């Protein structure tokens, strides 16, 4: 007999135990896949039937943990927006709660815990609770679920739900799966402890070679992580090849970053005139890092890199899972940071983006020269507390094309400085080989006849040092 079963009340399906510690070879991958999917489903409480949620926005009243660039009410509004982004999810009730810290075993004090427990029990519409903090500790999560008797979510879990919903391409799905790994790993020990408490023992050997429940789960997660890394490495290699081709062709790249739903895709659509881009008014609408061709006022071709949006109060590991594609943005020549000028929590959102870029080790010079574009100026402004925006912010409306010329001029100036290009006027014979070479190799923004000699033209071009050297060797230093 190849295996026996040990039923743990934490899982609906039995945990299979093998006499030699390993399943039959032909069943190994299938078994690991099924167990991994079961682990993900239970850890993140995945369901196709939707949810009805009580949202609790905790905040620290004073001390070092107090947030000073936002308010609990604005944080709660974002928590509501996160839930409303998910299909079939509804907010049943919501509240803010002041706490001394987020470190208690039960997260809340006795009074607040009882109040919340009673609220959940008395309202049958509440079938889950969302505690809007970046990540609950395993012990806190287990305690709260035992107290409330319903699934409990933190921000990491909710963002993963949204990522799963919005991931459509293979690249995005692989990176979402990679983003799940750190959370799964942090929960495995708690996953075991919860089961062991129910079967009343301190250890559970489920493999013939002495493997415990947690050993098997770690191995399953490790196998999936290894597989994901291999697939993502292929993506990274392909993107490196594309980047090297762009470098060879001397294309300048402009990364467009920002808080989720700040209007990054809308701005790229406005800057490039690409009607095929379809921005969506929702959080994390873009999970794929995509590249779009555009032209600066000098007719220099640039590539705009659209990126996944950032958000506050989630671990950096969640965003780092998208490194395979984020590298396109991190290695750009210029960064444009898009802010939502109409958002009441504008200051906090801008600070979140800058802090996230620092944690992702973006080049210091790139950060210092980052262009800030204040989008959505066509909407009513609701400036929040302690506004601290860059004095040289360029205000635009991607929807109405307001301020785009000023923004394009700033982008052009930064691109020229970052790539060593210069704008200059070159006098060449009209219709000659020099003129043809310049049209083919560099950006030409203007051509006028030479007023002193009609056989010549004056060409305003944007040219790199290398291109200028080649031009001189071909046509001047002969």
How does the language model describe each region?
Residues 64-70, 103-105, 166-167, 276-278, ...:
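Flexible beta-alpha connector loops of hexameric P-loop NTPases
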Residues 157-179:
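Short alpha-helix plus adjacent loop in nuclease-associated cores
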Residues 14-54, 186-262, 266-269, 273, ...:
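C-terminal-of-GTPase-core extension/linker across diverse P-loop GTPases
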Residues 60-63, 99-101, 134-137, 158-161, ...:
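Conserved nucleotide-binding/hydrolysis micro-motifs of P-loop NTPases
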């Amino acid at each position: 007999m190849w295996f026996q079963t040990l039923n743990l009340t934490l899982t609906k399906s039995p945990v299979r135990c093998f006499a030699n510690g390993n399943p039959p070879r032909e069943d190994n991958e299938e078994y690991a896949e099924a167990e991994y999917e079961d682990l993900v489903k239970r850890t993140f409480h995945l369901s196709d039937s939707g949810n009805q949620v009580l949202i609790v926005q905790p905040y620290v009243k004073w001390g070092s943990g107090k947030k000073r660039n936002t308010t609990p009410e604005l944080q709660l509004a974002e928590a509501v927006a996160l839930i409303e982004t998910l299909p079939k999810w509804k907010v049943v009730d919501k509240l803010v709660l002041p706490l001394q810290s987020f470190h208690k075993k039960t997260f809340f004090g006795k009074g607040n815990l009882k109040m919340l427990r009673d609220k959940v029990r008395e309202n049958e519409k509440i079938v889950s609770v969302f505690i809007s903090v970046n990540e609950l500790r395993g012990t806190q999560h287990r305690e709260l679920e035992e107290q409330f008797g319903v699934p409990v979510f933190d921000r990491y879990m909710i963002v993963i739900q949204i990522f799963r919903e919005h991931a459509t391409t293979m690249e995005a799905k692989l990176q979402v799966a990679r983003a799940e790994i750190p959370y799964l790993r942090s929960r495995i020990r708690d996953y075991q402890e919860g089961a062991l408490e129910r079967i009343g023992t301190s250890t559970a050997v489920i493999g013939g070679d002495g493997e415990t429940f947690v050993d098997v789960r770690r191995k399953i997660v490790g196998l999936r992580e290894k597989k994901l890394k291999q697939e993502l490495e292929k993506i990274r290699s392909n993107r490196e090849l594309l980047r090297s081709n762009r470098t060879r062709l001397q294309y300048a790249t402009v990364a467009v970053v920002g808080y989720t739903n700040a209007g990054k895709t809308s701005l790229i659509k406005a800057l490039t005139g690409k009607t095929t881009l379809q921005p969506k008014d929702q959080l994390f609408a873009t999970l794929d890092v995509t590249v779009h061709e555009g032209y600066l006022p000098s007719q220099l071709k640039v590539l705009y890199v659209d990126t996944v949006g950032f958000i506050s109060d989630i671990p950096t590991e969640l965003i780092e899972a998208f490194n395979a594609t984020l590298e396109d943005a991190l290695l750009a020549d210029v960064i444009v940071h898009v802010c939502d000028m109409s958002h009441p929590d504008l200051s906090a959102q801008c600070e979140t983006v800058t802090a996230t870029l620092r944690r992702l080790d973006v080049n210091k010079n790139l950060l210092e020269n980052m262009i800030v574009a204040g989008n959505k100026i066509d909407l009513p402004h609701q400036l929040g507390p302690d506004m601290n925006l860059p004095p040289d912010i360029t205000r635009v409306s991607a929807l109405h094309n307001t301020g785009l010329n000023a923004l394009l001029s700033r982008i052009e100036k930064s691109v020229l400085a970052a790539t060593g290009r210069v704008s200059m006027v070159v006098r060449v014979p009209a219709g000659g080989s020099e003129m043809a070479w310049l049209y083919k190799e560099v950006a030409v923004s203007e051509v006028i006849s030479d007023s002193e000699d009609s056989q010549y033209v004056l060409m305003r071009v944007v040219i790199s040092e290398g291109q200028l050297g080649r031009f001189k060797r071909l046509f001047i230093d002969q």
